[in-house]
Each structure stands twice: as C-alpha cells, then as structure tokens.
Amino acid sequence: AAPANAVTADDPTAIALKYNQDATKSERVAAARPGLPPEEQHCANCQFMQANVGEGDWKGCQLFPGKLINVNGWCASWTLKAG
C-alpha cells in the first residue's frame, strides 16, 4: 500500500507532470525524454529521485517536496541520473 504522503493521481503537480506511479501505464512512450529508451525510463534512474528519503519502493523527489513517489513510476520531467 502507498504511504500516507505518497503523491496521488489528483495532485496538481502530478497532473501537470503526467506522473503515474506505474511507468508502464504512463505516457512515457508518447512523451519520452532523451537519455534512455522509453521502456527504461522510471523514477529509480531519474536525477530528481531522492534515494535517501523514504523506504522500499517509495522515495522522495525534488519535484514533489514532502511527498513520496514510487520508484517504478514516471513523469514528464524524467531526466537520466548522472553516473
């Protein structure tokens, strides 16, 4: 189950960024970002994910302050993590 502070589908930022906690159900193919093939883009390899915040599949994100995103998610701001 999602934690209480997880980003929800009706969150205005989530809507604006087309965030979906399940990347396979997201618009990542239609709105793919440069860096990796669309099917390899997800929050876990995005530079905005904060690996030291949250636990398990739920981590922090610089784009959603104080909230948690699913590492298997995707949004239109996905950017390949350096390194």
UniProtKB/Swiss-Prot annotation:
- Which InterPro entries does the entry mention? High_potential_FeS_prot, HIPIP_sf
GO annotation, biological process: aerobic electron transport chain
What keywords does the record list, in alphabetical order?
Answer: 4Fe-4S, Electron transport, Iron, Iron-sulfur, Metal-binding, Transport
In terms of temperature dependence, the annotation states: Thermostable.
Asked whether the keyword Transferase is assigned, the reply is no
Domain of life according to the entry = Bacteria
Q: Which Pfam families match?
A: HIPIP
Note the coiled coil stretches, chain numbering: none
Annotated residues for binding of [4Fe-4S] cluster: 43, 46, 61, 75
SUPFAM superfamilies tied to this protein: HIPIP (high potential iron protein)
| Similarity comment text for this entry | Belongs to the high-potential iron-sulfur protein (HiPIP) family.
User: Function, please?
Assistant: Specific class of high-redox-potential 4Fe-4S ferredoxins. Functions in anaerobic electron transport in most purple and in some other photosynthetic bacteria and in at least one genus (Paracoccus) of halophilic, denitrifying bacteria.
- The protein's assembly and partners: Homodimer.
Q: Return the protein name.
A: High-potential iron-sulfur protein
**The species this protein was found in:** Thermochromatium tepidum
